[in-house]
């Protein structure tokens, strides 16, 4: 059975079967192609879980054909956002791939200037708060840094703004770190303290619609490129280079492959400097 066959009718209880017989999700590739055009995400045809979730979502919305799904996707921004939220869920946790974060902290610690830092995509915010915790632990005045988190997923951005995290999200933190930087409620949920939260601003953006120039000293874009084909990867790198100030640094994820941009010099594993 092909991956897109999951959108075809399946036997179930009698009433559901009656509705399913009217469904026609052939050519669902048209939907994934449109999502690629809008978001740059290319690997949907390989992700059975996301496709299953889209199938369930379409039934909840009482949409039973590819044509209707695609038509609504093009004109209904709220519907499009819900679809994006389904296909862009990315679980993360505090201190993930910490080596590069420690390098970032040492860079700021050894300088006297202020830093604008962008996490793109920021998911549910663990990365930016990890940076603040590490900076504060090293005695860096965190008023020197202004952090921004950009993401497509509105659900993830809401979580990041609330800064509420499960035990799993903070499992790499020490008990002292949890005590110093979080309030723990009666349900076992950890909330980041206000002193850190006020240093971060979260915004909804599509990387391919960003047109700023020389805005940031540091950009972290980790494990985003794995969702793009070569064309979109190269376009994303070009945009990141434009967003970086001269002499600024770009940090990629361990799983990311990027092309050798002429303005980027590799200074250590996963870290690149925009040459002045």
Please state what every model-predicted region is:
Residues 124-140:
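Conserved SAM-binding loop of SAM-dependent methyltransferases across substrates and taxa
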Residues 114-127, 146-148:
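Conserved class I S-adenosyl-L-methionine
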Residues 247-254:
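Conserved beta-strand signature within the Rossmann-like core of class I S-adenosyl-L-methionine
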Residues 106-109, 133-137, 162, 242:
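Short, well-ordered alpha-helices that flank and scaffold nucleotide-derived cofactor binding pockets
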Residues 143-220, 224-228, 232, 257-258, ...:
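Extended basic-aromatic, gly/pro-enriched interface segments that bind polyanionic ligands
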Residues 2-115, 218, 244:
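A short N-terminal interaction module
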Residues 234-246:
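A short glycine-rich, Lys/Arg-flanked "PGG" loop and its adjoining helix->strand segment in the class I
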Residues 258-276:
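Core SAM-dependent methyltransferase catalytic element
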């Amino acid at each position: 059975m092909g991956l897109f066959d999951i959108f075809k009718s399946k036997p179930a209880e009698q009433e559901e079967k009656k509705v399913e017989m009217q469904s026609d999700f052939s050519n669902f590739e048209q939907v994934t192609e449109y999502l690629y055009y809008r978001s740059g995400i290319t690997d949907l045809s390989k992700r059975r879980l996301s496709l299953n979730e889209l199938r369930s979502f379409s039934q909840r919305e009482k949409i039973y054909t590819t044509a209707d799904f695609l038509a609504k996707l093009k004109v209904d921004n709220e519907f499009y956002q819900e679809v994006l939220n389904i296909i862009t869920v990315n679980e993360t946790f505090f201190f993930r791939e910490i080596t590069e974060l420690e390098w970032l902290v040492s860079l700021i610690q050894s300088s006297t200037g202020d830093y604008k830092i962008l996490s793109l995509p920021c998911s549910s915010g663990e990365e930016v708060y990890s940076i603040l915790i590490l900076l504060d632990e090293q005695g860096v005045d965190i008023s020197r840094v202004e952090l921004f988190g950009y993401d497509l997923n509105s659900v993830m951005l809401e979580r990041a703004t609330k800064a509420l995290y499960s035990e799993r999200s903070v499992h790499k933190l020490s008990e002292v770190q949890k005590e110093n930087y979080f309030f723990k409620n009666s349900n076992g949920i950890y909330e980041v303290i206000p002193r850190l939260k006020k240093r971060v601003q979260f915004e909804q953006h599509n990387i391919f619609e960003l047109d700023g120039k020389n805005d940031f000293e540091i950009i972290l874009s980790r494990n985003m490129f794995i969702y793009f084909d070569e064309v979109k990867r190269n376009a994303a790198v070009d945009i990141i280079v434009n967003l970086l100030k001269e002499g600024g640094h770009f940090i990629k994820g361990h799983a990311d492959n990027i092309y050798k941009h002429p303005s980027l010099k590799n200074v250590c594993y996963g870290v690149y400097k925009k040459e002045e």
